[in-house]
Design a protein with these regions (language model features):
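DNA major-groove recognition helix of helix-turn-helix
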Residues: 34, 44, 52
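Short, charged recognition helix plus adjacent turn
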Residues: 8-13, 32, 43, 58-66
Length: 66
């Protein structure tokens, strides 16, 4: 998930802080999702996809979402 999440966020020209604010989580938590320290809940994973406007499911391949 890490590389794809960073790639899609940067294409949308969003910072980690902006993502965290839109998801109503801390920047530390969001950064943890990107670097693989934390795994998002299914609810947060779906919200990440929504915020990024990402339609494909493969943004979360090879991760422990849920």
């Amino acid at each position: 998930m890490r590389i794809k999440l960073i790639e899609v966020r940067k294409k949308k020209k969003l910072t980690q802080e902006q993502m965290a604010q839109r998801l109503n989580i801390s920047r530390t938590t969001y950064t943890g999702y990107e670097n693989g320290t934390f795994s998002p809940s299914l609810e947060i994973a779906l919200e990440i996809k929504k915020v990024l406007g990402y339609k494909k499911d493969d943004i979360f391949l090879n991760s422990n979402v849920g």
